[in-house]
A protein has these predicted regions:
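Short acidic/histidine-rich active-site segments
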Residues: 349-365
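Conserved glycosyltransferase catalytic-site signature
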Residues: 101-102, 121-123, 177, 333-338, ...
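Short hydrophobic alpha-helical segments that form membrane-spanning helices or hydrophobic packing faces
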Residues: 36-37, 149-152, 362, 444-450
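ATP-dependent adenylate-handling ligase core
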Residues: 295-346, 362-375, 449-453
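Adenosyl-5′-phosphate
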Residues: 1-4, 20-23, 115, 168-171, ...
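Cysteine-centered catalytic environments shared across enzyme families
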Residues: 1-326, 337, 537
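Soluble or luminal CAZymes and related metallo-dependent hydrolases
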Residues: 240-244, 248, 332-336, 407, ...
Length: 546
């Protein structure tokens, strides 16, 4: 877990602004911080980095890393899974002075140029300054596991690992009415480059951005559709199955190979599949700790650490979300996940693993998830003005198969990018690093490619890799947590925030009477649309923190 920030341009007191930006990311790492400032074209460039050392095998090197011999400056947030293999390949051409992945990145760039990113297996957000060419490169991993945000103001470029770091530089903080309106009406999180904040963009997954001091240009160094076509054209079913099995084994080693203890959440199919793969391929005894979300009335199992979620925790976590969420949150699931991260940290863990990515392999998470661009809720809560701001999401269809098209949209545009952003910020706030080993390589592309050359459908061939007992990996039905959490303090918190929304700067977007009626119904234990209530609370949390 790391945080990177940067400024390029003619900025007054650049060093102080850079320090303020980094200070806003101090929760992402407390193992020291590094600053680097230099001239750039006709202005200046500055980068800073803070981090939390997770790996127990890799050398800790202060960043931004300055490679004087290659004239490259690098700052990275992420994990390079194959850095040892890349280092071995590069040793014939370069002399290494550290045993760190960041130096490998520097040498890899000098050897292969922009083509180096395609050789990397891992999750990363990278800022790399080529001093010979006077160009700044910014790159993001294949599926956008690691975040990267940027904005321009008065001809200057600002970038960072979280949106709050941009505001830390003194830039204006304003929500995007258009983006929030589209979320309220259509449930869309927006295109891959957009955010819920005015004038703030994110670098899309698999993208590479260049800045030469005068203009920004962007291209894709990775395209999943191109990789699927390449896999299908070059390999038959037997070869693809072998590649899939190898990728699953590799993913297991990414979980725990460089840490002494690692946490896993159980209760969902993807996480349980991780444990099955670990048992199948072996792991060091004592490395693994498992969690299960529960409430205070559940007896602790001997081999599972319960995640206590008491009514008092709910309000506490909701209050904290105001400072870290930066976009809509998902109610119960976000609260439980954040409590897991916090408890893992108290247990002394640096790393918690998730099975995100395996969902794509099974497909069930994305079954029937295509967006029909219609109102998702009765819109009597909203004023006609909201519909004028909201734009219907529209995505291209390059897949012949409709299921693949829907999966691709959720993978690259909607659900998965949102989940990854929430994972990143909530884990950073809690002080742990989340590993998503199934999104660092080629597993997702293989899950698309194999059905194209096989007589079996996706679920049929995936059954081969499931635990012997199918029942052991089925999601467990649980009673809703709302009745257990329905404390007076939670009702008061919700009533206060809905009232603030009805009186605030965006009240004209709502029918205020309907908004207050929803709040009253909730507090009086009457049925309400909880998803819609969470949307309104998410919006107010961001407004209330302005």
């Amino acid at each position: 877990m790391s945080g990177i920030v940067g400024i390029v341009g003619d900025v007054y007191e650049l060093e102080y602004r850079l320090a303020d930006m980094l200070r806003s990311l101090r929760h992402r790492g407390d193992c020291g911080s590094g600053f680097w400032v230099s001239s750039f074209v006709e202005s200046r460039i500055g980068m800073a980095h803070c981090g939390r050392m997770v790996s127990e095998t890799e050398e800790d090197v202060r960043q931004p890393y300055v490679d004087e011999e290659e004239q490259v400056v690098v700052a990275v947030d992420g994990d390079i899974y194959n850095y040892a293999e890349l280092r071995e390949e590069l040793q014939a051409h370069y002399t290494f002075v550290t045993d760190s992945s960041v130096e490998v990145l520097s040498k890899a760039y000098r050897q292969w140029g922009e083509g180096c990113f395609a050789r990397i297996n891992g999750v990363f957000a990278i800022a790399l300054y080529d001093r010979r060419e006077d160009v700044l490169l910014m790159a993001r991993d294949r599926y956008g596991v690691k975040p990267f945000y940027y904005t321009t103001s008065k001809g200057n470029l600002y970038f960072g690992s979280e949106i709050k770091s941009l505001f830390g530089a003194g830039l204006n903080r304003r929500i995007s009415i258009e983006r929030w309106a589209a979320y309220m009406l259509y449930g869309t999180y927006g295109p891959s480059y957009s955010t819920f904040w005015e004038s703030v963009s994110q670098l899309p997954a698999g993208a590479l951005m260049r800045y030469n001091g005068y203009s920004l240009s962007e291209s894709n160094w990775y395209d999943i559709k191109e990789e699927i076509e390449r896999l299908v054209s070059l390999h038959d079913e037997t070869a693809l199955r072998t590649m899939l099995e190898q990728e699953l084994r590799t993913c297991v080693s990414r979980c725990m190979s460089d840490v002494s203890v690692c946490g896993f959440r159980i209760g969902r199919r993807a996480e349980l599949q991780i444990l099955h793969n670990i048992a199948q391929h072996g792991c060091q005894s004592g490395k693994m700790r498992t969690f299960a979300d529960t409430t205070e009335d559940v007896v602790e199992q001997s081999d599972v650490l319960p995640i206590w979620v008491a009514p008092s925790h709910v309000v506490e976590e909701l209050q904290r979300m105001k400072s870290w969420a930066e976009e809509p949150f998902d109610g119960c699931e976000t609260i439980v996940r954040t409590r897991l991260f916090r408890q893992a940290r108290r247990q002394g863990m640096k790393v918690v693993c998730s099975g995100v990515g395996l969902d794509v392999l099974w497909q069930d998470v994305w079954d029937n998830s295509g967006r029909n661009c219609s109102y998702l809720y009765p819109h009597k809560l909203f004023s006609p003005l909201l519909a004028l701001y909201a734009a219907k999401p529209a995505y291209g269809s390059d897949f012949v198969n409709e299921d693949d098209r829907n999966r691709y949209c959720e993978l690259s545009q909607e659900r998965l990018p949102h989940i990854l952003r929430v994972y990143d910020r909530s884990s950073a706030e809690a002080g742990v690093s989340v590993r998503l080993p199934f999104l660092g390589g080629h597993l997702v592309a293989l899950s698309f490619a194999l059905p194209l050359v096989s007589r079996q459908n996706r679920k049929e061939f995936v059954a081969h890799y499931m635990p012997p007992s199918r029942k052991s990996i089925e999601p467990v039905e649980k009673e809703p947590l709302y009745p257990q959490w329905m404390s007076q303090s939670l009702k008061e918190w919700i009533a206060y925030n809905i009232e603030a929304l009805s009186m605030g700067e965006v009240r004209e977007l709502f029918d205020v009477k309907q908004l207050r009626r929803m709040s009253n119904n909730f507090c009086n234990n009457k049925p309400v649309d909880m998803a819609l209530l969470w949307k309104c609370l998410s919006l107010q949390c961001q407004l209330g923190d302005e």
